[in-house]
Amino acid sequence: MRKSVIAGNWKMHMTCAEAKSYLEEFIPLIKNIKDDRKVVIAPPFTAISTFSDHSDFEYLDISSQNIHWEDQGAFTAEISPKMLLEHGVSYAIVGHSEPRKYFSESDEQINKRAVFAQSSGLTPIVCVGETLEQRERGEADRVITRQVEQGLENTDPSNLIVAYEPIWAIGTGKTCEAEDANKICSLIRKLIGFDDVIIQYGGSVKPNNIDEIMSMSDIDGVLVGGASLDPNSFARIANYQ
């Protein structure tokens, strides 16, 4: 049985002091969480040490928001696996729509990040998703197929999370219908060819829609943006019914 992964991506939010206050409020809210799921938070790099130093760290895992495909070198603004592992990081988000959009990150680069994350002992959370224009033209399946085939080449599906994030639903308040999201997640699973691969949905996930999302057969978790910044909101999501 696949274990659900409920992940929060803080993006460029939270100082170390704010992260500490958040954890003090959040951790008691998930102490009795069911054992069929994991909770993961991806704080900014500066706040990762706040997580690893927290006394109740066992209640959740840490993810980075990016990772490079080299252990060291002249790669300004990047971060390497060994730097992250030193702080207890277990996961790394790669291929999020924001670096794809703002920094023109390619499927080839995303693949290099994912492969190196796995070889370094981290689990990559690889994001895929179509734009509104691509969806309206009926190209969603083709776009997702390309991103999966190119972005996941030579990865190990037993140590992998794929997050389906329709770009038009990220931070917009628009949510992909649960059945539609489930169809795409089913497609991703078939493309990968491994039934136990964990597939998340991301895109305006909130406390009022989490139960329906998690009732879908091919959705194994969520990647949450804005709603993960509020400890009560994210705790409700983590404790979905």
UniProtKB/Swiss-Prot annotation:
Signal peptide: none annotated. Keywords: Cytoplasm, Gluconeogenesis, Glycolysis, Isomerase. It is an enzyme of class 5 (isomerase). The active site is at residues 96, 165. It comes from the Bacteria. Involved in the gluconeogenesis. Catalyzes stereospecifically the conversion of dihydroxyacetone phosphate (DHAP) to D-glyceraldehyde-3-phosphate (G3P). Pathway: Carbohydrate biosynthesis; gluconeogenesis; Carbohydrate degradation; glycolysis; D-glyceraldehyde 3-phosphate from glycerone phosphate: step 1/1. It catalyses: D-glyceraldehyde 3-phosphate = dihydroxyacetone phosphate. The keyword Magnesium does not apply. Its EC number is 5.3.1.1. Homodimer. It is found in: Cytoplasm. Belongs to the triosephosphate isomerase family. Substrate binds at residues 9-11, 171, 204, 225-226. It comes from Prochlorococcus marinus (strain MIT 9301). This is Triosephosphate isomerase.
